[in-house]
């Protein structure tokens, strides 16, 4: 994006918001949520579903908040692992691969790499390439999973929902942490975090976090290696003006594996045998995934005397990805697999900008908490692609060291996307009633430029997204709600003729109930929903062109319980039922269920802290995850076997024996070392689940 164009867009948006502020004369403070005095709410607060801090009990949408304490206790080393005990989510789409954070929401896998947000701004990955971004959980404060369409506030997004990440911010109380860890598969690493004020007046605070991690992947000899650093600074310019600066520098010089194997040989025997779940079908000299991510951004906010506030968020990112992969391409004979080659070099730059104005006004007995916003996204990705072939490999007795039969340049492209959105939200409160209305208008431009063949395709579209929701707060902590919302997802995918596909559109009806016992520390929720999406971009095999296949419908039920059963016992439990099927498609796919979408999922995590006695400081925890009803392909030829995984943690706070700030923890995931296939894209590409992982860590907090 040219600098002058970006400056023009930013200035135009700032002027529009500034003009709105000039006419604002409302007296109420924007950050306070109005509640009836007789309703006592101790609800956790979310902002992903509304862009404003709102108690979850007052939010007429399914939201799960995964705290740092939760995902650290469970030993999560990626965002997808951190949400694995969350309803409505399937985070095992590619099994043991840790390269990307694939997160399937309410059965929708398309765009699952592009529904992640950091500090309110889209991560801006390109799903039509290998340039998909990740943030290590070490740098996160919490994770919100917002289920259902969110286009009314965010524009293009999956109808299944979004994942909203919140980074760790500078604190004016000095402190820090150092952590060392090691485990099986040669896992090892270190992390640190330090924060505190930089001046005596506590106007400026800084934070610096960093980590490194290394491991042999499940598919030897591939490795996983990561280095990341996040500096941030908070400046209280005045009592009413605050500036937050942040940067994120991330390097994965080794990205592990990301490949599948045939259904025959993984799920069921082939020629009387099964392939090992550690089998590597590639060539070490030719398999490589190297990702560099650099982000820098700011958030500036000002509170006016009349209680209204204005804020601007901006983030710029630049990524560079190199991919070389030798992959299996079906059985050649009784023991050997054909092999192909895929290579890519990519450079991507993107800007995400969001301007917001919010405040409150009363109209009679109704309080309106208003949010007006203008956001802008611009992404450009330059890609060069190669394909080729390698000699076959024996899947049961592999011999490595082969050279390619050929490698050929097949594409040199530029993918461009630009989105400008104007949105309005009104959160109304009247007695115990809560009404939410929202609308958004988007202008979206998508271009695919084929430099190799000197051609291009363009798509310019406008879209209107809406939301309407109603919730009632009973004084016993029960809150039933009903909502309607829409979604749209413009794409850079093209058909076999090079034409960019039409944006996917979705609509959802959702009904649910939330319950928070007064005076307690528990949250319970239940939701039923139906989502219909049209113009879906998909392909049946990796080499096939993308196409629009019509309409898909997802219906489901989600249950969640988060409870502190006592001062020592914590419970997290969830159940998900998902029925997602093609409603309008080819005759072969009509009525069939989508891949990557389990019919049933259930999970529970229970932990216990010993508060007194000889074992004071000890934490014991265990979790169980059950998955059932994953189909093998789009024709539903087979259903994968159900699987159950057991996880556990043992922690010890050594402060109880006088070693203040020191703690130790042991995490074991897949305790029984279950061999299973997590999902299949087709009968040609199925993905082994992760084997047992054992990691011990020692931390010192100061």
Swiss-Prot record:
Task: Describe its membrane topology.
Answer: Multi-pass membrane protein
> Which residues constitute the signal peptide according to the record?
1-30
Question: Where on the tree of life does the source sit, at the highest rank?
Answer: Bacteria
PROSITE patterns reported in the protein's UniProt record: TONB_DEPENDENT_REC_3 (PS52016)
The keyword Ion transport appears for this protein: yes
Boundaries of each TBDR plug domain copy?
55-168
Q: Which UniProt keywords apply?
A: Cell outer membrane, Ion transport, Iron, Iron transport, Membrane, Receptor, Signal, TonB box, Transmembrane, Transmembrane beta strand, Transport
Q: Which InterPro entries match?
A: Plug_dom, Plug_dom_sf, TonB-dep_rcpt-like, TonB-dep_rcpt_b-brl, TonB_rcpt_b-brl_sf, TonB_sidphr_rcpt
Q: Which residues form the TBDR beta-barrel domain?
A: 173-702
Cell compartments where the protein resides:
Cell outer membrane
Pfam families referenced in this protein's UniProt entry, alphabetically:
Plug (PF07715), TonB_dep_Rec_b-barrel (PF00593)
Please provide, alphabetically and separated by semicolons, the GO molecular function terms listed in this UniProt record. Answer: siderophore uptake transmembrane transporter activity; signaling receptor activity
Q: What cystine linkages occur within this chain?
A: none
Gene Ontology cellular-component terms for this entry are: cell outer membrane
Q: What does this protein do?
A: Ferrioxamine binding and uptake, in association with the TonB protein. May play a role in intestinal colonization.
Report the family membership.
Answer: Belongs to the TonB-dependent receptor family.
The protein's name in its UniProt record: Ferrioxamine B receptor
Organism listed in the record: Salmonella typhimurium (strain SL1344)
């Amino acid at each position: 994006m040219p600098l002058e164009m970006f400056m023009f867009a930013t200035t135009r948006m700032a002027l529009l918001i500034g003009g709105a502020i000039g006419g604002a004369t409302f007296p109420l403070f924007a950050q306070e949520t109005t509640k009836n005095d007789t309703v006592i709410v101790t609800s956790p607060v979310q902002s992903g579903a509304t862009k404003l801090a709102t108690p979850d009990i007052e939010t007429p949408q399914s939201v799960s908040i995964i705290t740092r304490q939760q995902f650290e206790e469970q030993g999560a080393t990626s965002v997808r692992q951190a949400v694995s005990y969350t309803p409505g989510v399937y985070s095992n789409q590619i099994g043991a691969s840790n390269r990307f954070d694939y997160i399937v929401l309410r059965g929708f896998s398309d765009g699952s790499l592009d529904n992640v947000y950091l500090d309110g701004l889209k991560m801006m990955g390109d799903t039509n390439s290998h340039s998909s971004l990740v943030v290590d959980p070490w740098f996160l404060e919490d994770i919100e999973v917002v289920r259902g369409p969110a286009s009314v506030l965010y524009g293009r997004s999956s109808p299944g929902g979004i994942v909203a990440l919140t980074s760790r911010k500078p604190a004016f109380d000095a402190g820090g942490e150092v952590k060392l860890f090691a485990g099986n598969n040669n896992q090892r690493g270190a992390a640190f975090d330090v924060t505190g004020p930089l001046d005596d007046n506590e106007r400026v605070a800084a934070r610096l976090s960093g980590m490194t991690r290394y491991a042999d992947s499940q598919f030897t000899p591939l490795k996983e290696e990561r280095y990341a650093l996040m500096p941030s600074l908070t400046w209280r310019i005045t009592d009413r003006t605050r500036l937050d600066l942040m940067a994120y520098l991330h390097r994965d010089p080794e990205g592990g594996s990301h490949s599948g194997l045939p259904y025959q040989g993984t799920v069921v025997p082939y020629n009387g045998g099964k392939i090992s779940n550690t089998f590597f079908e590639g060539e070490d000299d030719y398999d490589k995934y190297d990702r560099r991510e650099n982000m820098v951004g700011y958030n500036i906010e000002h509170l006016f005397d009349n209680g209204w506030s204005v804020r601007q968020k901006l983030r710029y990112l630049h990524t560079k990805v190199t991919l070389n992969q030798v992959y299996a391409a079906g059985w050649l004979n009784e023991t050997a697999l054909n092999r192909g080659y895929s290579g890519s070099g990519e450079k991507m730059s993107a800007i995400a900008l969001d301007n917001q104005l919010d405040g409150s006004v009363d109209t009679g007995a109704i309080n309106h908490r208003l949010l007006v916003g203008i956001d802008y996204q611009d992404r450009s990705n330059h890609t060069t692609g190669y394909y080729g072939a390698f000699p076959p490999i024996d899947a049961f007795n592999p011999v490595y060291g082969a050279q390619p039969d050929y490698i050929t340049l097949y594409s040199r492209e530029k993918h461009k996307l630009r989105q400008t959105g104007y949105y309005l939200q009104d959160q109304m409160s009247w007695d115990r009633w809560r009404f939410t209305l929202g609308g958004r208008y988007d202008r979206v431009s998508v271009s695919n430029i084929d430099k190799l063949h000197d051609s291009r395709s363009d798509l310019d579209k406008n879209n209107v997204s809406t939301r309407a929701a109603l919730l009632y707060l009973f004084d016993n902590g029960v809150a039933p709600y009903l909502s309607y919302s829409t979604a749209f997802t413009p794409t850079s995918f093209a058909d076999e003729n090079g034409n960019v596909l039409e944006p996917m559109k979705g609509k959802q009806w959702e009904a649910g109930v939330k319950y928070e016992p007064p005076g307690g520390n528990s949250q319970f929720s239940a939701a039923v929903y139906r989502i219909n999406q049209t113009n879906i971009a998909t392909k049946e095999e990796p080499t096939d062109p993308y196409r629009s296949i019509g309409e898909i419908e997802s219906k489901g039920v989600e249950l969640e319980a988060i409870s502190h059963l006592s001062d020592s016992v914590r419970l997290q439990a969830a159940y998900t039922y998902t029925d997602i099927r093609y409603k309008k498609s080819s005759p072969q796919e009509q009525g069939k269920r989508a891949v990557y979408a389990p019919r049933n999922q259930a999970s529970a995590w229970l932990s216990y802290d010993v508060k007194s006695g000889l074992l004071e400081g000890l934490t014991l925890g265990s979790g169980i995850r059950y998955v059932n009803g994953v189909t093998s392909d789009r024709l539903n030829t087979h259903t994968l076997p159900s699987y159950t995984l057991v996880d556990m943690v043992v922690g010890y706070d050594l402060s109880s024996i006088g070693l203040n700030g020191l703690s130790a923890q042991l995490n074991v995931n897949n305790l029984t070392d279950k061999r299973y296939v997590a999902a299949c894209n087709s009968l040609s590409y199925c993905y082994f689940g992760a084997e047992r992982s054992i990691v011990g860590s020692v931390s010192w907090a100061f």
